[in-house]
Amino acid sequence: MKYKIAEGQEIDFKDMDNSFFLIGLLNEFMNRYQVLADRFFCEISWKQCFLLICINLFKEAPTLKEVSEIMGTSHQNVKQMLIRLEKLDYVRLETDPSDKRKQRITLTEKTKKFNEENDAPSQEIMNQLFSCVDKEELEITINTILKLDAQLKLMR
């Protein structure tokens, strides 16, 4: 399998197992996506934006543990991002009234404004990115990644 790294430059991965190639490709893709998204969002990074998206998925203010689980990363990584986002007034960390050991994460008005300002431009970027992928290909890719994700969770 040949992979184009730049105009006129290709690397041949024919001797590499496809599973290893896929994991490398996913990492390379996420690195490129992160660079693009970091340039798009001025005040916060793509990973911080992803954290805000994950928090917003919950109906009630989630805990650090819940957000860490949905993001697939450590409590320490999430906590560091939350500290920065709290300083920038995107989130508030509040003690859970029913369990003082837990902290609940609440989105602020600044986050709501951020979402309103960035929803349409973000959708345009996603439309442009996925313009070369049809619906069936996208569904197959999603299902494959979901299977791999479930397997990773079993391997913990």
Q: For each predicted feature, which ranges?
A:
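N-terminal helix-turn-helix DNA-binding core of bacterial DNA-binding proteins
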Residues: Q34-S74
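N-terminal positioning helix adjacent to the helix-turn-helix/winged-helix DNA-binding module
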Residues: N18, I44-Q48, K110, E137
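Charged, amphipathic alpha-helical coiled-coil/dimerization segments
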Residues: K4, I83-I142
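C-terminal regulatory/oligomerization modules of transcriptional regulators
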Residues: M1-K14, E136-R156
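Hydrophobic structural patches
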Residues: L26, L52-I55, I145
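N-terminal leader segment of winged-helix/HTH proteins
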Residues: M1-C42
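Alpha-helical linker/hinge and terminal dimerization helices associated
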Residues: L26-F29, Y33-A37, F114, N118-V133, ...
